[in-house]
Curated annotation (Swiss-Prot):
Organism annotation: Klebsiella pneumoniae
UniProt: Zn(2+) binding residues: C73, C76, C89, C92
InterPro entries: HybF, Hydgase_Ni_incorp_HypA/HybF_CS, HypA/HybF
Transmembrane region(s): none
Keyword match Membrane: no
Gene Ontology terms: biological process: protein maturation; protein modification process
Record family assignment: Belongs to the HypA/HybF family. HybF subfamily.
HAMAP family to which the protein is assigned, alphabetical: HybF_subfam, HypA_HybF
Organismal lineage: Bacteria, Pseudomonadati, Pseudomonadota, Gammaproteobacteria, Enterobacterales
Pfam families noted in UniProt: HypA (PF01155)
Keyword Metal-binding: yes
Positions of Ni(2+) binding: H2, E3
Name of the protein in question: Hydrogenase maturation factor HybF
Described purpose of this protein according to its UniProt entry: Involved in the maturation of [NiFe] hydrogenases. Required for nickel insertion into the metal center of the hydrogenase.
Length: 113
């Protein structure tokens, strides 16, 4: 379950950002998850709660935005938006795609008091 390691990394970033900005308690966190990141949303919520235990983010509300992946088509030389690994280019139908974005997880923003 790689969700736990992703959430531990996100919790580290949240702690660092809260400290830098003088936030004593984080109330909300927004994560962007790429469509190809291979994470289970319910597992992400569960692991996030564990990763944030005993931190400034304990008990915060987690918001998850799934963003489409971007790929480069080798056959028609165009960018394409895809939502799954076995995607085809919407422009030419080719399966020869190189993922350029959307297989990661990032902390988009946070709110606190």
């Amino acid at each position: 379950m790689h969700e736990l390691s992703l959430c531990m990394s996100a919790a580290d970033i949240i702690r660092e950002q809260a400290e830098q900005h003088g936030i004593a308690r984080v109330t909300d966190v927004w994560l962007e998850v790429g469509a190809l990141a291979d994470v289970e949303e319910s597992a992400l919520h569960f692991c996030f709660d564990i990763a944030c235990r005993d931190t400034v983010a304990q008990g915060c509300t987690l918001h998850i935005d799934v963003i489409p992946a971007q790929a480069w088509c080798w056959d028609c030389s165009r960018e394409a938006e895809i939502m799954q690994h076995a995607g085809c280019c919407p422009h030419c139908g080719s399966e020869r795609l190189r993922i350029t974005e959307g297989d990661d997880l990032r902390v988009k923003s946070l709110e606190g008091e």
